[in-house]
Amino acid sequence: TLPMMTSCCPGWVNFVEKVHPEIIPNLSTTRSPQAIFGSLAKTWFAREHGINPDKLRFISIMPCTAKKDEAARSQLKNDGMPDTDLVLTVREFARVLRRHGIDLLQIAESEFDSPFMSQNTGAGAIFGVTGGVMEAAVRTVYHVVTGKELGHVVYEPARGKQWVKEGTVDLGEKGKVKIAVVHGLANVEKILEEIREGKCEYHFIEVMACPGGCVDGGGTIRAKNSYLDKMDARTQSIYRIDADRPIRQSHRNPDVIRLYDEFLEKPLSHRAETLLHTNYKDRQQKRRNPGIAEIWEKVRLG
């Protein structure tokens, strides 16, 4: 259903299910990165290393408090076993480090351990900022359709829509794709209204619940009265990481290529559909007007 809307932000997914369930058909069925990693860890990684999935624990460190709710979703369990066992926010992880006397600034830099899916690209890095998910996806779509690599995606402020940026990607013979990026749930209502009325001009829309994206998530470390400066600094750092990466496209990640070659077989295979995709349900609380008899009974009982 067009326009397609991103599904990696659990705060946004919760908002759709609880407030605007009529938008569910527009949500991409792709799981969030956390949910995908968990499902692959409990299947491919466990199989490769001969580990019983029941004995494996996946702990996720996230800037987002809504990731805790996502980890508990019934759709993200296999035979009752959650794909993600525990979610710590960045603030919670910082408390753990402090409790054990660990100061990251005093520790020499080193490479991460690489047990599983540890090679990362610029496209993976920019997921953390508003517009990054869209750009990462469009880089791969452009390559699949045209066989070429896409340059920088240019966004312009959308007229009459606060906190919304829009752009156009030319896919050659396939035509042009109109994209939009919105962050902050208070700013998405205008677009939702256009979708309901059949007037939305976009094909693909990225929505992030937190202003600025995940870099300013509810679980991030904050300082009083200076969070905007820190958000800008984090954003610039992420774009520098993207620019410095030798590989900037998801489809060129060697780990992703090996994943499909050795396990998933191909995009949209049965195994890929099972492990990389999910579904949503209407969780809207229906308001019920009490009848006269019910009201009178409450009055009578005081």
Locate each region found by the language model.
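Iron-sulfur-associated redox domains of electron-transfer enzymes in respiratory
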Residues: 1-302
